[in-house]
Amino acid sequence: MSSSSTNNTDPHIAVLAFPFGTHAAPLLNIIHRLATASPKTHFSFFNTSTSNTKIFPTSKHGGELLNVKAYDVWNGVSEGYVQVGKPQEDIELFVKAAPESFRMGIKAAVAELGREVSCLVSDAFFWFAAEMAEEMGVPWVPFWTAGPHSLSAHVHTELIRETIGVGGSFLIY
């Protein structure tokens, strides 16, 4: 979608996806629903190339909707890097690079569209997205892709630790 076919005052929503597991697909699903309901709103969907290729219906990441565009961000793995085999290494590398990768992606989308971001939507555990939204002066909408039980566990982590214990002092049944 070129900037010539858009109105610079229409909303521009930046969406930050977590590319691992099943996080990105449900987020894209809700974005597609919002894009259908609000055709003048542009949604810039930031994700890794690998994940975008898997979840978008076309190989060019354009999707079916003209107001949703995928942008590829860096996965955090430098060229020539040899992974050491830690189970979560790819996730750790991505999360370390994500804040700057997303900032660069947003900057490119704003330049391409000629529209500033008016709202930031992200996977809920991207803590840095709140800071990014504050820096941009826009609302942040964290989206929880998992079920309510895991959210409850995260919200009540301290209570669980106080009740059950951590380290060497575990509650034994």
Regions found by a protein language model. Give the residues of each.
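Glycosyltransferase specificity loop/lid
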Residues: M1-Y173
